[in-house]
């Protein structure tokens, strides 16, 4: 597996990441954990150490599958990237970010997230709620 340094973080991530948006799901539109967890673990066993998910993937159950899959591994060597929706002013409020972060951490059953990304960020929301002093990320 080829690994590259992720930006200025110093973390070496696999050039091939595992996107967890299309994991097997049941008729209830929830992740099929019995199928998904072994698939994720097989990817990790083959050298993939970067897993991408998001708050809304498969009705939020993608993060649960990722969390269960990574439990069997050294967490310092498997990197999880997830996304929080911030497409409107309501989503960009600090208390909403905190609420969603708490949900994500619970779903992943992890004390931390390696990489968090803005999902659906508009320029209006960025300038109004994120880039200003004392903003959501301040």
Task: List each language-model region with its residue ranges.
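Active-site beta-loop-alpha junctions enriched in small/polar residues
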Residues: 21-23, 54-56, 83-87, 118-121
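Generic beta-strand or strand-like secondary-structure segments
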Residues: 65-68, 83, 96-103
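Glycine/proline-rich, positively charged
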Residues: 89-138
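N-terminal binding-site loop/beta-alpha segment at the start of enzyme catalytic domains
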Residues: 1-78
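Non-cysteine beta-strand/loop elements that form the S-adenosyl-L-methionine
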Residues: 15, 19, 81, 110, ...
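Generic structural signal for helix capping and beta-alpha/helix-loop junctions
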Residues: 25, 60, 87-88, 125
């Amino acid at each position: 597996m080829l690994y590259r340094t992720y930006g200025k973080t110093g973390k070496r991530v696999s050039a091939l990441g595992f996107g967890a948006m299309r994991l097997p799901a049941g008729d209830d539109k929830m992740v099929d954990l019995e199928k998904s967890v072994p698939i994720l673990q097989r990817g990790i066993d083959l050298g993939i150490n970067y897993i991408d998910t998001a708050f809304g993937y498969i009705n939020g159950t993608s993060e649960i599958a990722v969390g269960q899959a990574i439990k069997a591994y050294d967490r310092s060597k498997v990197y999880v990237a997830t996304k929080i929706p911030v497409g409107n002013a309501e989503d960009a409020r600090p208390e909403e970010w905190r609420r969603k972060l708490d949900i994500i951490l619970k779903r992943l059953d992890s004390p931390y997230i390696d990489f968090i990304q803005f999902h659906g960020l508009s320029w209006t929301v960025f300038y109004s709620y994120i880039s200003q002093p004392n903003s959501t990320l301040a």
